[in-house]
Structure formats: C-alpha cells, structure tokens
Amino acid sequence: MFVSTFSTGEISPMFFRQFSLSARARLGCAGVGEGLSRFHDTSDEVKVMSVKTAVEKTGNNTPLQILAPDGTVVRPDLMPKLSDDELRELMRRMVFTRVWDQRAISLNRQGRLGFYAPVAGQEACMIGSEAALSKEDFILPSYRDIPQMVWHGFPLYKAFLYSRGHIEGGRIPEDVNVLMPQIIIAAQCTQAAGVAMGYKLRGEKRVAITYFGDGATSQGDFYEGMNFAGVYKLPVIFFSQNNGYAISVPFEKQTAAENIAVKAVAAGIASARVDGMDVLAVYHAVQEAKQRGINGEGATLIEALTYRYGPHTMAGDDPTRYRTGEEQGEWEQKDPLIRFRKFLESKGLWSEKDEEAVIEEAKQAVADAIKKADETPKMKVSELIDVMFETLPPALEEQKAEYLAKESK
C-alpha cells in the first residue's frame, strides 16, 4: 500500500540537517491524542502577568526567551515547572508534527489531500501553546492550526478528511473542545470572545484561545474581538503567530505599528511578545495568560515571532518570489526542534534513539490515519443536506428525495 512506502527519504533535507533522528522507547506514549492529560493541568503557582505592553513588561522590544538558539537557558527564573516526562513529551509532539507535516505535503502533491497549509518552523508555537491548556479549554484555529486541534483530541484521520472536503472531517467529537479551522481571516477572534463570554457568564474556570497570523491583525474582526474581550474582561487568549508574511506581504507593509503586541493597548488588555521558536517561552506565556483569564483579569494578546519554512499553502504559493534563501537560512538556525533537542540532550533527556522511535511512531500513525480516511465511505449529497437543519424544511426534503433517487441508481 502507498502509505507503507513512507520513508525518511520523503522528509525534506531541512528536517534532518543538524537534526538527529528520534525518540526513546516511544517515551511510553502511544498514538496521537493519547497520553495528553499530562499537560492538561494548570499550576496555581504561576506568576500573574500584569496589564502592560511588551515594551513596558521587558523594558525593550525584545521578545521573551527562555532558551537561546543553542539550547542554553537564559531565563531560569521563568522555566515552566514541567517534569522530565513532560519535557520529553513536548519534544515528541514537535518531532511527530514535523514528520506528519512532511507526509501531508507529499500526499497533497500526489492528489490524495486537498487544501493544506504547511506548519514546519512553527511547531513551538503550536505545541507549546496547546500543552499549556486544559482539555476543557476551547481552541478556535485558523487553517494552519490543525496540530493544536489534533493534540487537543481531534482524530488525525478526521483532519485528513477535512482536507479532502469530506463531511466527516467536520464532525467534531463531543468531548473535544475545538471548532473547525476558520477560513475567513480573523473571524475566529470574535467567535473566541463569544465563547469566553459564555464561560464568564456560567462562572466556569476555562479559557478560549484563538490562533491567527500576522495578516489577520489588519482585519476588523481582530479589533472587534479584542475590544469586546477588553470591555467584559473575558478569559480569552488571542495568539498571533507572526511569521513575517501575510501570504507574500511582509509585516512592515501591512501595518505602521512597531509590533503586534502593542495593538492590545487600544483594547485595554494585556500583551506579551515571545520567541515563537522557543517552546518553553511559548508555554510560559500561554500559562500566564490562562491564569489571568481564570482569575478574572481578562484577555491577553500574545505575539509569537516565528517563521514558516514552506509555502503559505500548497495551492501554488512560491515563497522564493518574496523572500530570500539567506533569510530562511537565518531562521533555520533558530529551529525550534534543534533548540529544544540541544536543551534536552544537555539534561540527558533525549537521544538519537529517542528521536528515531518518534519518527517511526509518527510514520505509522499517519499511515493508519490515511488508511482510515481512505476507508471512510464517500460523501453523499443527501448526507450533506441532513446536517443543515435539525428539522429539514420542505424544499430541502424535496431536494434530498431527488438526490436519494439519483444515488440509488
């Protein structure tokens, strides 16, 4: 079968450059979605972030960083209180996600997946932020944020069906607190504010987090969502993955603001800038923002500085037309997987054998998910009509009958 041919040779050379292959004894972890509860606790001891801009918080415009690119700890006072197993699990998820990403790109090129937005380079933002949440917290993603959904419990095979436009890909399990990715840029910001308002009215200790790129911060829904959250002091986290380009438009050509974090000032909410290639810095920032939210202190805007190595999407974007190889090379030196791997190795928590095990685990999990997606019955128009209303109006009943007649032939 095709999926069984997935070998390390199908993963881009960038993944392996300086990056040894692996994962120890599977780290005691099974497939995607299993063993996630270890991250779904929030410490009451986390320091509370004050309502200040990033400039006021750090004394300059430098993003928060805990690990330097060489893996050394530069802010030991901000180190998250994670066990050795939890640190290894962060690495496992990042390695797994990169393998899955490369496989998805390959499947897209062969016509076996539809719309897909590559994630390589942004794993620290995705994995670090989701790991700081509880299972009860709600994720409202954009189209690039499939990893956060899957690590929050959304089945991987459904993610592949979603990419194919299959209705089953949009059926979210009742116990998984996510919405499907928002294609309308920044629309999820107002939706997240609404989810958070519901939590506040019910007195629930939960937060909503919404993800978007730097381009979304030029949209009206971004400002409306933040303003609403600011007025009502809602438990919501606005997480901007600033990879420097809104498709092909560089950051400096879409806003006169010095950075994204300062845009929180107008809404009267807290903000922070973090090194989005540092998984521990991301974890720390989201943990603080969550604590603020459940303590009734309101919303937080987080700007994570990161970089996508591949195209904006697989729909024909050519990043070489608007950025240089030299620029990408500079960002690859800050690679989140390489950085965290060096940190773990210095603590004796990671080895080449560990990494190899995770790669094999990821390849098998992706193969199994694709197989399950392939075996899912093809979607019928009559099924699509059934999910539009709880009780179908007469006009749709007639249309359904027509399609059922056609499908039965």
Summary of predicted features, one role per range:
Residues 99-102, 106-232, 250-256, 261, ...:
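Cofactor-binding active-site loop characterized by glycine-rich and histidine/acidic residues
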Residues 10-13:
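Intrinsically disordered, low-complexity segments enriched in serine/proline and basic residues
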Residues 180-375:
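Glycine-rich ThDP/TPP pyrophosphate-binding loop and its adjacent helix/strand module
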Residues 68, 141, 273-275:
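Structural signal for conserved beta-strand scaffold positions within catalytic alpha/beta enzyme cores
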Residues 15-124, 317-320, 325-409:
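Conserved acidic/glycine
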Residues 72-73, 146, 243-246:
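A short, flexible beta-alpha/helix-coil linker loop
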Residues 143, 304-306, 388:
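A general secondary-structure junction signal
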Residues 4-7:
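Short linear motifs in intrinsically disordered, low-complexity N-terminal regions enriched in Ser/Thr
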